[in-house]
């Protein structure tokens, strides 16, 4: 008797053979069902060719007279184990029990041989599955856990004595097939996958048993043809249908008409290959990919079609409406004209997703394989593909400017520092100009004049004819950022520097190798003043003169200079100034000035083109794809009162609205400036200020809250904070002494207490000391502004909600009502900055550098706001305090 170990050792390479032959033998041409009982003689020839395993192979039968293989031994073995009691040869008890034990690895109870009826009313086919290794195992598609790739590729290099799960599927499928047909029928299942060869599978049809196997119902009728010879690993696969492809008939292939109604199979001819010399399973040798199999429409089955999940599909974006902006309209119009000349026929299925993927014949999509999309439909969808407009008409932002409208932006206020031409400015000069260890530096009063030719003249005092020093402004000069510096015992002073700046390319190695263009500053002069209006007026005058400097001839020493990294930086800065009404915070008057600065490092001579979102060129832009710059707005604006640097070709701008210029090498300069209309309906936050004077008591209170109508405040995730917020309350000169106190180091300004009671020491000569409270930031009197300054570093605060209000309160008791001046300042000054935003909505849409496509391009946006808010005059703030005691104010509650 053949033992189980001998059988396993003999057929260990046959358990995983990939079959290419039909599951059942092919009948002779012209034969009917009477031929099957008479074909038992072929089993004798099979027995004679396999003397090694005679006891196992004596029940196998081969219907093919020309093709014989060693795999008939395995099929005979399985046929004996699964044949009904009426079969000529019964399997040995040991072998049957061994196979039953294998099955118990899958289920707790052994399989029972279920005999299927020999006649069926309809021809059913098995569903091929790519995860099944052979045709014999196609009777049952494994579950998701069973079809895991780790089951097949656990250890392909070493043979295993224990039977694998793939062999159990093979035995299960053949056991069901032998039960339906007859116990004497067997098949030649010897063909296997070859290394680096394409497996050609022909159309196969056979009977499908009605009873369920392992709890899985039989699959509906499907025709398999040329299914791919590779293995894919996908879960939750119900079925992988493959279309029917007619194959050419061979001379010895029978026709469907010659087969009798009781013939349980009908297969066309196939060819046989030698068995590979390998161990149990070796799936590492993958066959060539057959792209054509992906494009065939699947057969209609009763099972629901399987559809993979698209990880890039966002269902929440289905309701987004298209935007009118389409930068590729010219391309699609040309494609549409070409497509009209030739008619393209195709059927397009209903797409189950809104995101567009053009499906080519060799592309794999996440939709059903039976649903296709024609090229014209894809082009039509691309034409409608539009970006969501961040500034729709329905929101608080203003629509595009009207190019035909005659509305001009408001002129600067007559009291503004921008509109007042000055002959000179009283300033303070830092002496000595350079630091010296042996001497101390101090501030000395001077008078400064700025000539039209760009000369800065310094006088000891106003009215002198001859300056004691004079120097000329150059294109490499820059004005530093304004800052506050210690001045005297009263407070600080506004200071600035005029520097000579040169940029050099330096290579850094830490923390990683990089090339940086560092600025080296050399101080030319340092000036200061305690008058903030004079300070701003002088800064704007110097900036205007630097922009009007004539362009010098090109330095030939820098023409041949080659930079390791070429780059160009564009800085857009908006300056907003205006007046806001009291109560409702409506903008009564505003002025928006936009400045564009350029800093470039380009080798040799380079001609640059800059494109803005000018309303006059809307729809007429012609730029290269690599020159398009990303923008955060789709608004188109109208430019007013444009002024240009000397390197800009104004004739080209007037004709094409494109800024054509030759940038200065390694020098930051102002390219142009223009005025626009404010692009928002509200300011970033609202400020309401009320003041009351009752005899000798003065009270001032402000409420600050973020404005929901501002575009940046609509989404908390993309909200841009206001930085360095200053709210200045002008203080009459008679009241300054009430806000000063003596200390060990001299007089200091009183500071506001945050959410706690105030105790400022002894009372002053004119009454009790003032009480100041704030809920956020700090507040104190600053002599540089002659005002009480409420400073907030960041608004909204990180620890508070966006809509949380903040409060400032000040209570002052004077010595008598005679100290109350007859006239008060009726405005509160507000000043702050916002990075990465634009008050004018001006945006750079394209930057082109001639013959330099690899130049690094940078665009920076910033906005600076400075405006006045009217103060509400009230007899008493008690209604606003909700009846609380004025002498013990607690209006600013704890957050």
UniProtKB/Swiss-Prot annotation:
Motif NPF 1 positions after renumbering to this chain: 310-312
Q: Name one Pfam family in it.
A: Adap_comp_sub
Q: Where is this region: Disordered?
A: 10-101, 144-204, 236-279, 291-326, 386-424
Question: Biased-composition ranges for Polar residues?
Answer: 145-169, 179-193, 311-323
Q: Which residues carry this modification: Phosphoserine?
A: 278, 284, 299, 759
Instruction: Spell out the family assignment given in the record's similarity comment.
Output: Belongs to the Stoned B family.
What is this protein called in UniProt? Stonin-2
